[in-house]
Structures are given as C-alpha cells and as structure tokens.
A protein has these predicted regions:
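Beta-strand->loop->alpha-helix junctions that form or flank phosphate-binding loops
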Residues: 1-14, 33-39, 63-67, 175-176
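Nucleotide phosphate-binding/pyrophosphate-handling subdomain across enzymes
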Residues: 24-142
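Short glycine-rich anion-binding loops that position phosphate/pyrophosphate groups of nucleotides
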Residues: 93, 120-123, 148-151, 200-203
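Short amphipathic alpha-helical segments
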Residues: 100, 128-130, 156-157, 186-187, ...
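C-terminal helical cap/extension that packs against the catalytic core
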Residues: 134-191
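Short, flexible loop segments at boundaries between secondary-structure elements
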Residues: 145-148, 215-220
C-alpha cells in the first residue's frame, strides 16, 4: 500500500475518546469513533480499517466493535480509584511507549492532572536510552521514579532510579517495593489527580497498593 492511500482526517478528541474520518484515495470511507485517546490508538484503528477494507469487509458493518473496544490489558488500563484519584496501569517501558501513554492520558484528563510513576525496567535499557527517557515525560506535571526493576540483570554503577530522577526537574525518587512507594506517594496526592504506573515490572501492583493506602490510616 502507498502510505497515503488511507488517511485519518478531522480528528476530534475528548475525555470520552476520539472520532475521525477515514479517507481512502481521497474518498471518504467512513467516520469512526473509538473510546480510546492518543495518536497511537487512532493510527491502530486506521490500520485495522485499512486491512478490513482491503479484505473486502464493509467497514460500516463493524464500526460498533470499535466503539465497544476499551483497550488491551496493561495498556492505559483503568485499575480503580481512591479518594477521587484515578489509577491507571501501563506496560510502557520504552521512551516512545511512555510518550504515547502520557499523550493519551493528557488528552483525556489534562496534563496538569497526570502523575507518572516510572519504574525503569533493566539497568541496560535505562543506561542505553537515558537521554530518550529524559524526554519522555512532557505530558505530565509530576514524575515519580522508583528503583530499577532489574529483571535478573546485575547492577550497573551509577545507573539507578535515584540518579535518573535527579536529571528531571519535576521528578522525585521513591525507594522500596510498591507498598513502600504507595505509602510515600499517597499522602501527597490530591482529588482529581490521575496516577499512571509505567513499566514492565512490579509497578503493575501500584494501583492496588494505593487503594490499600486509602483504607489504611498509616498511609495518611
């Protein structure tokens, strides 16, 4: 396919999702609405529509499935709420994935409400993509960096969550396991904040630990 055969135009986004027109060779193919936000999700939907159209499927007959689709597990997944604070979990552990996740979050909730909690995954990845990671957190007002999830790797001297946090103006370092991180983070959160855990390790348990804090006076 020529890269210009299928194009998404008139893109409209809100906290409820995205809608856009799909053009095929400059002719309107359909209007599509999805529950997801973020450019990457729009591109994904566009790719699916292109594949279906090439296979001869009537796009209008399957549009409702796009509306019903709420996303994959651990991809900007809503895992609960506590004290009017929304909790999300995302597997993103690469700079481009983090940027995509935070872009979607900012569209839905506003950059000024997003608290990103980043658990670096592997010392070698953090070292190799150090500068790329530093540029991945524009779409949030606050960044929490935890200890590195080693994934069986040996420690690399000088490469740590604490040292990485020092390179970001709006970042803070919080040490320990996810229970400890939640206990440090919870008292600093406010109603309306949206916490999104980012990483491929134990960060996935952060939402549950924050909910536990909401029920535990020791966290306040």
């Amino acid at each position: 396919l020529n890269e210009a055969d299928y194009v998404a135009q008139n893109i409209r986004t809100s906290k409820d999702g995205s809608s856009f027109d799909i053009y095929y060779k400059n002719n309107l193919l359909c209007n599509l609405k999805i529950q997801l936000t973020g450019k990457h999700n729009i591109y994904n939907a566009l790719s699916v529509c292109a594949s279906l159209n090439e296979a001869g499927v009537d796009i209008d007959s399957v549009k409702k499935y796009f509306v019903d689709f709420t996303g994959m597990g651990r991809r900007f997944q809503h895992v609960g709420s506590v004290n009017e604070i929304e909790l999300y979990d995302d597997y993103a552990h690469h700079p481009t994935e983090i940027m995509a996740a935070l872009d979607a979050a900012a569209v839905k909730f506003g950059k000024e409400n997003i608290v990103a909690v980043f658990q670096p995954h592997r010392y070698t990845r953090l070292k190799g993509l150090w500068e790329d990671f530093r540029g991945a957190f524009d779409n949030c007002f606050r960044v929490i960096v935890t200890d590195v999830y080693a994934a069986s790797e040996d420690v690399i001297e000088g490469i740590s969550g604490e040292n990485f946090a020092k390179t970001l103006e709006k970042a803070e370092y919080m040490s320990g396991n996810m229970q400890s991180v939640a206990q440090q983070l919870f008292p600093t959160l406010k109603s309306g904040n949206v916490v999104i855990g980012l990483g491929a390790g134990t960060i996935t348990f952060l939402g549950k630990e924050l909910q536990n804090c909401g029920e535990n006076l020791l966290c306040r």
